[in-house]
Amino acid sequence: MPDDASDLADRVQAGDLRLYELDDETDADTAAAARRAVLERETDADTDALGAFAFDADQAADTAVENLTGGAQLPLGVAGPVALSGGAADGEYYLPMATTEGALVASVNRGCSAITAAGGANARVTKTGMTRAPVFRVADVTEGAEVAQWADDNTDALAAAAESTTSHGELTDVTPYVVGDNVYLRFRYDTKDAMGMNMATIATEAASELVEDETPAELVAVSGNLCTDKKPAAINAVEGRGRTVTADVTIPQDVVEERFDTTPAAIEEANTRKNLIGSAKAGSLGFNAHAANVVAAVFLATGQDAAQVVEGANAITTVEARDDALYASVNLASLEVGTVGGGTTLPTQREALDVLGVRGGGDPAGANADALAEIIAVGALAGEINLLAALASRRLSAAHADLGR
């Protein structure tokens, strides 16, 4: 530890400095070392591993985290390659997955192998749009209806106000909802290759000022939870948020039997009774086996917002036993991804995006984020097929035992 880091830690413990004030005293690396020193002294923890990180401390402190103390590392594996024909992604892809769940990468890898043996999966982004829904206070429902009508009649003016804050985002629609003396306006934006949450928030604040200037409505909060961000929500399942993407594949029966030791009919029954009926009985918004596993692992590997796995797991898996084949699909209703900004600028996350060939802005704009969404959807499909097959063949517990997990 540098002497100055130790001295700074002394000052923190003496009450002369707060942890967040260390950034004003020195560079980010030294400030992080000082924070680790404070933690070691006050908790008796060993923080050597926290201090062994590969990213640039100054960049991380400026853009990613406050009170930078170190780095958290996760094992990263790759599944694939998996063949994919999409609207933006086309070819064979290795899927980088950061996880601590043993057997997950092996599970997805097995599904990828079957998909590729079948000639590859199809994938399409069918809807895009990051949303933000401010809530306004009005006198009563009559006034609320008038504000909602004003919003419907003045979409162009709202777009001009919102788009004045960004050179990339475009307002695509505004949907009003009136609940008593509350008016919610759900703004939807095309944020191109950015995940776009910050962009949408800043743009919506500007549009909300126009609403207040032109109507009796008073802004209470720029987010009224009808967006809906980082929470399970039916509106995201129905209307979508981020990217709505579907992947599907038809796998010949002989491939199913050879690779999974089961039949298309058995996999279909497992899906119907588990993912559809079981999920309905549970009141689940996710009618799938474990789509969140793949979404979370790829999100961590590629620098996405990990909390938005909540929306990403909003998925429906369908399976049909067709003539001598298995048809399977996964629809992810609200997958929020980006290939620019945020965590995508960190070095290991940049490399993972490079493995997929989608780092940075796409040509046309939005193409790289679309491609990432399609790749994740195919990865989720691979995971769904393999887990359902393992359940149908009663091999799930044996697979975990074989891998020592």
From Swiss-Prot:
Report the top EC class in one word.
oxidoreductase
What GO CC annotations are associated with the protein?
Answer: cytoplasm
Q: Which reaction does it catalyse?
A: (R)-mevalonate + 2 NADP(+) + CoA = (3S)-3-hydroxy-3-methylglutaryl-CoA + 2 NADPH + 2 H(+)
* Control of this protein's activity: Is competitively inhibited by lovastatin (formerly called mevinolin). Lovastatin also blocks the growth of H.salinarum, and this effect is reversed by addition of mevalonate, indicating the critical role that the mevalonate pathway plays in isoprenoid biosynthesis by these archaea.
Tagged with keyword Lipid biosynthesis: yes
Q: In which pathway does it act?
A: Metabolic intermediate biosynthesis; (R)-mevalonate biosynthesis; (R)-mevalonate from acetyl-CoA: step 3/3
> What GO terms in the biological process aspect are recorded for it?
coenzyme A metabolic process; isoprenoid biosynthetic process; sterol biosynthetic process
List the keywords (alphabetical): Cytoplasm, Isoprene biosynthesis, Lipid biosynthesis, Lipid metabolism, NADP, Oxidoreductase
A GO molecular-function term, please?
hydroxymethylglutaryl-CoA reductase (NADPH) activity
EC number, as in UniProt? 1.1.1.34
Protein localization = Cytoplasm
Q: Which CDD domains match?
A: HMG-CoA_reductase_classI
Query: InterPro entries in the record, alphabetically?
Result: HMG_CoA_Rdtase (IPR002202), HMG_CoA_Rdtase_cat_sf (IPR023074), HMG_CoA_Rdtase_CS (IPR023076), HMG_CoA_Rdtase_eu_arc (IPR004554), HMG_CoA_Rdtase_NAD(P)-bd_sf (IPR009023), HMG_CoA_Rdtase_sub-bd_dom_sf (IPR009029)
Q: Where is the active site?
A: 101 (charge relay system), 305 (charge relay system), 400 (proton donor)
| Pfam family name, one | HMG-CoA_red
Family affiliation: Belongs to the HMG-CoA reductase family.
What do we know about how this protein assembles, alone or with others? Answer: Homodimer.
Q: What does this protein do?
A: Catalyzes the NADPH-dependent reductive deacylation of (S)-3-hydroxy-3-methylglutaryl-CoA (HMG-CoA) to (R)-mevalonate. Cannot use NADH instead of NADPH. Functions in the mevalonate (MVA) pathway leading to isopentenyl diphosphate (IPP), a key precursor for the biosynthesis of isoprenoid compounds such as archaeal membrane lipids.
What is the protein name for this chain? 3-hydroxy-3-methylglutaryl-coenzyme A reductase
Source species of the chain:
Halobacterium salinarum (strain ATCC 29341 / DSM 671 / R1)
Lineage summary: Archaea, Methanobacteriati, Methanobacteriota, Stenosarchaea group, Halobacteria
